[in-house]
């Protein structure tokens, strides 16, 4: 019995069939390739025509002419490769990975459109069997080399190929090498490198195996890679069940750090993947950037769609065949809350244990008037925003001080932004009637914490306290123990900018050089205008009072107050004799000043 011929016949009848035949030598592999090609040529004409037309259609399957390179990345990860190398040469491009080698059963799915050897493999990303057919955007002929197989594909036909001379870095039995001949001008080094600019190290974050991707074109070479560190394990409530989640740190070549959470969940009875097997568990993963300014994305292994949240999320979402978006499938909708569970737990973990100022991880509402499309990434963003307002807002606990105990957000008072440089923690705590003031150590420098809390407050989340307002802080002007003149100056200036002039005119909000607090009433007090002479001919009368030196400082606070006092005719130049006499002639006020 010719075992090899029998195995080929079996695969031609059922490409998913299991064959255990060994192909030990290049000669046997070449014979198998010829038998496969003969079987395809002997097939019914209608089937050959369908395959040929499918290949023609694959040329325009994606709007990205180099989509096939993304497919190579996906296939390499499915093969368990740790490295993928892409090398553009003068007349071809080589794509090589160090994953599992080529088997007889792999040959037909590599070359035939809509034929996949991964449909029954729940863990593999591939499913449609069309990805490598997008090669037709570059060429109609290509080769694969992996001992003992050396195969050339041309349309729907295949034949043995001569082993090529390969660079040392990708030669040897450990490597599977795809060779893609290119006509002159088909792909330049500039075009390849420009395409690759859309990728970065973080593109590899949620792959299962691939850790390094190198692209070389001419004298230019770029490497994407991540260095990984196992951090810990956490028990996280996902989909209503406590699950073990692995926590790792991944660092990019430019030093950016990501905190990655991965777990496995049990599928529901009604979960069904499109054209793909469903395993006994479903992987879920999120990657959170520990630095702000990083864009997010939705992955199905590789990034597929942008996500307007500082997170990369992954599970077994159903993509469309071109992998340029996601299908409108029931499963995709069912997986959104599962991802949100892991995301909420991860963000809380970062804020509580890693970086108390990582507010950039929390989404904010879209600008008014924007209408998000009903795409998967939009539904994910909406779910994460809702989850943040609900569970995260109520469950998050932050330290009350450095080294101090944690407290829920409802126990913290915060001041409105205008008061940030005016009040200290004791003022905020007292005015906000709260156990604690939100400490500086949990406030990010960009102020996103304030926007997040404002959104949560507006959503009625977690009974957050209202901000201490400027009008509340004006009560401190009547507090004899509030003696810090610099802060009193700031509070007065802030109150003016907030439109509370009518309140200030009745308050002792000004401090003289000798420490008295007086009201800004021209009928009661005249204050020396520091812009005039330091002395005047009528100083002996004592009717013009010197303000505290804090009002003469060159800052916005002092300038706001002195400008206001001028408008109210409360400032008098010492060398303006007429004005001083007028002040002296104000009867009861002058007598009070002289006494």
Regions found by a protein language model. Give the residues of each.
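Amphipathic alpha-helical coiled-coil/helical-bundle segments that mediate oligomerization/assembly
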Residues: 1-20, 182, 223, 228-233, ...
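GHKL (Bergerat-fold) ATPase N-terminal catalytic module, capturing the glycine-rich phosphate-binding loop
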Residues: 1-190
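Active-site-proximal structural scaffolding
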Residues: 65, 103, 128, 137, ...
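A broad structural signal for short, well-ordered beta-strand segments within beta-sheet-rich domains
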Residues: 81, 139-141, 209-213, 220, ...
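Residues at beta-strand starts and edge strands
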Residues: 82, 91, 174-176, 209-211, ...
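Acidic/polar loop patches that form or flank catalytic/metal-binding clefts of enzymes
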Residues: 144-147, 151-153, 213-215, 352-357
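ATP-binding catalytic core of ATPases
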Residues: 159-250, 333
């Amino acid at each position: 019995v010719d075992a090899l011929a029998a195995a080929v016949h079996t695969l031609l009848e059922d490409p998913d069939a299991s064959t255990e035949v060994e192909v030990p030598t290049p000669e046997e592999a070449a014979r198998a390739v010829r038998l496969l090609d003969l079987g395809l040529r002997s097939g019914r004409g209608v089937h050959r025509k369908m395959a040929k037309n499918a290949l023609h259609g694959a040329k325009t399957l994606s709007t990205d002419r180099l989509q096939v390179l993304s497919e190579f990345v996906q296939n390499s990860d499915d093969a368990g490769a740790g490295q993928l190398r892409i090398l553009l040469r003068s007349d071809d491009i080589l794509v090589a990975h160090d994953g599992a080698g080529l088997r007889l059963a792999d040959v037909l799915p590599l070359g035939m459109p809509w034929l996949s050897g991964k449909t029954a493999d729940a863990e593999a990303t591939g499913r449609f069997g069309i990805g490598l057919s997008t090669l037709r955007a570059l060429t109609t002929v290509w080769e694969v080399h992996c001992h003992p197989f050396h195969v050339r594909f041309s349309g729907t036909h295949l034949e043995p190929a001569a082993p090529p001379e390969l660079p040392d870095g990708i030669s040897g039995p450990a490597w599977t090498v795809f060779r893609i001949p290119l006509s002159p001008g088909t792909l330049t080094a500039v075009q390849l490198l420009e395409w690759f600019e859309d990728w970065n190290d973080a593109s590899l974050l949620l792959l299962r195996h691939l850790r390094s991707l190198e692209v070389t074109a001419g004298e230019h070479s770029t490497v994407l890679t991540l260095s990984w560190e196992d951090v810990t394990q956490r028990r996280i409530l996902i989909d209503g069940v406590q699950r073990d989640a692995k926590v790792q740190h991944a660092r990019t070549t430019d030093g950016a750090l990501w905190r990655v959470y991965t777990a496995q969940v049990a599928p529901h009875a009604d979960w069904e993947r499109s054209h793909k097997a469903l395993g006994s568990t479903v992987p879920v993963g999120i990657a959170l950037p520990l630095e702000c300014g990083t864009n997010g994305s939705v992955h199905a292994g590789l990034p597929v769609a942008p996500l307007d949240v500082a997170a990369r999320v992954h599970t077994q979402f159903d993509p469309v065949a071109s992998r340029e978006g996601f299908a409108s499938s029931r499963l995709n909708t069912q997986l959104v809350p599962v991802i949100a569970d892991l995301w909420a737990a991860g963000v809380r973990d970062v804020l509580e244990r890693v970086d108390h100022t990582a507010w950039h991880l929390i989404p904010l509402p879209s600008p008014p008037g924007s209408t998000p499309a009903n795409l998967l990434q939009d539904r994910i963003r909406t779910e994460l925003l809702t989850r943040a307002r609900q569970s995260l807002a109520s469950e998050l606990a932050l330290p009350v001080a450095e080294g101090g105990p944690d407290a829920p957000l409802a126990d913290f008072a915060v001041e409105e932004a205008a008061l940030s440089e005016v009040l200290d923690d004791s003022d905020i705590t007292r005015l906000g009637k709260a156990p604690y003031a939100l400490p500086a150590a949990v406030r990010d420098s960009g102020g996103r914490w304030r926007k997040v809390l404002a959104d949560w407050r507006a959503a009625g989340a977690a009974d957050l306290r209202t901000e201490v307002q400027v009008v509340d802080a004006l009560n401190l002007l009547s507090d004899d123990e509030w003696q810090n003149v610099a802060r009193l100056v700031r509070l007065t200036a802030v109150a003016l900018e907030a439109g509370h002039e009518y309140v200030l005119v009745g308050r002792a909000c000004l401090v003289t050089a000798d420490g008295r607090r007086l009201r800004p009433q021209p009928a009661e007090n005249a204050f020396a205008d520091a812009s005039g002479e330091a002395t005047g001919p009528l100083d002996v009368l004592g009717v013009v009072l010197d303000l505290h030196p804090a009002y003469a400082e060159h800052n916005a606070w002092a300038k706001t107050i002195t400008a206001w006092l001028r408008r109210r005719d409360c400032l008098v130049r010492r060398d303006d004799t007429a004005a001083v006499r007028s002040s002296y002639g104000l009867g009861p006020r002058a007598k009070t000043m002289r006494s």
